[in-house]
Amino acid sequence: MYDFFMTWLLPFLIIVGKTLLLLVVLLVLVAYLLYADRKIWAAVQLRRGPNVVGPWGLLQSFADLIKFVVKEPIIPAGANKGVFLLAPFVSATLALSTWAVIPVSEGWEVAKINVGLLYILAISSLEVYGVIMGGWASNSKYPFLGALRSAAQMVSYEVSIGFVLVTVILISGSLDLTTIVLKQGQGLGTTLGLPFNSFLDWNWLVLFPMFIIFFISALAETNRPPFDLVEAESELVAGHMVEYSSTPYMLFFLGEYVAIVLMCALTTILFLGGWLPPLDVWWLNWIPGVIWFVLKVCFVFFWFAIVKAFVPRYRYDQLMRLGWKVFLPLSLAMVVITAAFLKFTNFV
């Protein structure tokens, strides 16, 4: 009995506890990043934004959650009921499951696997199925058009994201996210002979063109402005979510924002040193790594919100041209250049 407890039951309970803790922290983080997104957009438009529910409107996201849950879900008469209700659960579940391998600090992840980057790429590629299922099952042309746009958009920019990940793998020599973070101490700062490691060692400087490509591709992959063609209000209203209401709509919305925060976390891990402090000095190392990680995720999300507020929406042909005629050749060329550079130098 003791062997069973130590070998099977205890590890299972630890994983369940980690998963529940991650879900709670992630959902609270999403709630307040959504609040920050609305506040930033309001400030740009000279409005106050959420300010009624709770002090300074801090509980607005939780009030919205209650509003969605207590509403009645309406299913269109001609919809495929089973697929219609399953689609938002697929979208939200896949978005949440990608966080299983995200290390918020060294040793702080639900599942430690040595191909974490490949796992994230595989699971995030499946998220489009929830959108397609929702658009098709609604039995309406506008959701279906939004779903088709989403599929084309995600396929177009996943190729560029894949090549960006290849360059990071070449630099770090690993698919393990923890190793990728720890390897970011061999960049330009160390080469210049600085007395301590700094943010100059991180991949954002060494792979700056790929950093920009990844950031813009992340906007397109998550349907954020200026690439929100999937739910363009002026033409498709809410895209694949037109016929949804109540909890199913909330699940689609949750999956979308969890994917956005995931891209912010990936940007932090791949290019901004993960949980490493900006300067390797004792008074910054004293701060827990998870605090640095969350601060960097919030910093990246701030730029997501700024782009949403300032950049006008692209046309669909411009979106496709940028993905296939600009980012794809550039990212492929950078893979070749990075591989050649590493082959003939001792940089890594």
UniProtKB/Swiss-Prot annotation:
Where does it reside? Answer: Cell inner membrane
Keyword list (alphabetical) reads:
Cell inner membrane, Cell membrane, Membrane, NAD, Quinone, Translocase, Transmembrane, Transmembrane helix, Ubiquinone
Major location category of this protein:
membrane
GO BP annotations of the record are: aerobic respiration
- Give one GO molecular function term: NADH dehydrogenase activity
Task: Tell me what topology the record assigns in the membrane.
Answer: Multi-pass membrane protein
A Pfam family this chain is assigned to: NADHdh
EC numbers listed for it are 7.1.1.-
Q: Which InterPro entries match?
A: NADH_UbQ_OxRdtase_su1/FPO (IPR001694), NADH_UbQ_OxRdtase_su1_CS (IPR018086)
* GO cellular component entries: plasma membrane
Segments spanning the bilayer are: 10-30, 82-102, 115-135, 161-181, 199-219, 251-271, 287-307, 322-342
Q: Which domain of life is it from?
A: Bacteria
Q: What reaction gets catalysed by this protein?
A: a quinone + NADH + 5 H(+)(in) = a quinol + NAD(+) + 4 H(+)(out)
Q: What does this protein do?
A: NDH-1 shuttles electrons from NADH, via FMN and iron-sulfur (Fe-S) centers, to quinones in the respiratory chain. The immediate electron acceptor for the enzyme in this species is believed to be ubiquinone. Couples the redox reaction to proton translocation (for every two electrons transferred, four hydrogen ions are translocated across the cytoplasmic membrane), and thus conserves the redox energy in a proton gradient. This subunit may bind ubiquinone.
* Family in the record: Belongs to the complex I subunit 1 family.
Q: How does it assemble?
A: NDH-1 is composed of 14 different subunits. Subunits NuoA, H, J, K, L, M, N constitute the membrane sector of the complex.
- Which protein are we looking at? NADH-quinone oxidoreductase subunit H
